[in-house]
From Swiss-Prot:
The chain crosses the membrane at residues 10-30, 63-83, 96-116, 131-165, 204-224, 240-260, 305-325, 359-379, 391-411, 449-469, 476-496. This is Na(+)/H(+) antiporter NhaB. Belongs to the NhaB Na(+)/H(+) (TC 2.A.34) antiporter family. It catalyses: 2 Na(+)(in) + 3 H(+)(out) = 2 Na(+)(out) + 3 H(+)(in).
Amino acid sequence: MPLTMSQAFIGNFLGNSPKWYKIAILSFLIINPILFFYVSPFVAGWVLVLEFIFTLAMALKCYPLQPGGLLAIEAVAIGMTSANQVLHEIEANLEVLLLLVFMVAGIYFMKQLLLFAFTKIITKVRSKILVSLMFCLTSAFLSAFLDALTVIAVIIAVAVGFYAIYHKVASGKDFSAVHDHTSESNTQLNNSELESFRGFLRNLLMHAGVGTALGGVCTMVGEPQNLIIAAQANWQFGEFVVRMSPVTVPVLIAGILTCLLVEKFRIFGYGAKLPDAVHKILCDYAAHEDAHRTNKDKMKLVIQVLVGVWLIAGLALHLASVGLVGLSVIILTTAFNGITDEHALGKAFEEALPFTALLAVFFAVVAVIIDQHLFAPVIQWALSYEGNTQLVIFYIANGLLSMVSDNVFVGTVYINEVKAALIDGQITRDQFDLLAVAINTGTNLPSVATPNGQAAFLFLLTSALAPLIRLSYGRMVWMALPYTIVLSVVGVLAIETGFLEQATQYFYDSHMIIHHSAKDVIAPLTSH
């Protein structure tokens, strides 16, 4: 029996999403205008934010761009915000969008080098604790200079590569054979071996994911919101690192200890060992690759190392904006490694562009938050406190919201509100700088709790790898729990005990950083 037009509409709407999810989104689209026009724009605004958070939480049911985008389009259409305000938010965060477009694509052309490095870690080091630690620390180091999303994209590529190699060989084929590693129907695979390998990959990906948060919070390029906060505070790369260090250094040490402990005691789903048979396959593959590596291939690796040095130097010395450094990485790696085919270049942009579009939708929701003054009561309440208590409240408020909502727009909203308070004369410039540290660390550290908070975690959850290694939303939350508790508590203690304030004063006295004036914040605003 042919489908009716209404059945066809529901069938097409949001594709393969569950029917209840489709009905929920359609209900949201009907409810929002009623709330906005007949109840209260403030209530409608908060409902929209909660609905948007719901679409992020349900990322495995449907990629959030479409449902979130429909909610954002309707918000503009009914007057919750304007298209101009959305454009203004995107303009203000253009560097973040450029970072996602160019930096992620640039690192795509350096994957060979990173695959080479991570393959060596797994094949040469047999201790699971040591491998976990190396993945965590390597991710932390890379995330300090690259966007966390980029680092996770690389680790995903590494894990997919390992999974595909094992699946191919275990299915009775050789390394060069064409094979569909997503197929579940192969009877030759050893199920217990496959499950152990999946557990091992899940462990490494979660350690690496948390590593990106540990390293990402330290520098202005580590996470998209860091760049936004640094721009509002008018800090350069070095100053950002110094100002964050009283919180980020103790947190990094605590994170490393957590990595060791969860592996040692095999708790929260950690401690899965790499089966010997799988290790042998990966070692054979590494030996096969080494034996067949030509001088041309070796030269490509050398070029990628040199471009990596330029990348770190360019960012550390702030020689150009982050996005432009990323563009230079694309040009240098492709030019010297002979990648000139348009289709080969296009593949590099496939990973990041859907998320870049989703980020533009985030900024539409930020525009609603700003226009409807949704956060004003929270901000005013927090500013009514003084000293370390005020900093702790901002840290916790950012942290709680970042656990359930994307930390990019949480950080953006809070720094904008605090900047407005500075311009109104409610706080001093030194207080603003301390609050910027509390906001940055608050959005970055507790947000590892769920995939909603960390863009890198959401990217991992929505990747093609997640179903292959059975990494669900609930499992990610459970595995992130020990890190969430430790990182959040250590961050709070670093602020609450006065260590942040005392260390910052020491940095001023040692002339490592300087006192800024409020004009540094107001000037860019008025010149916009």
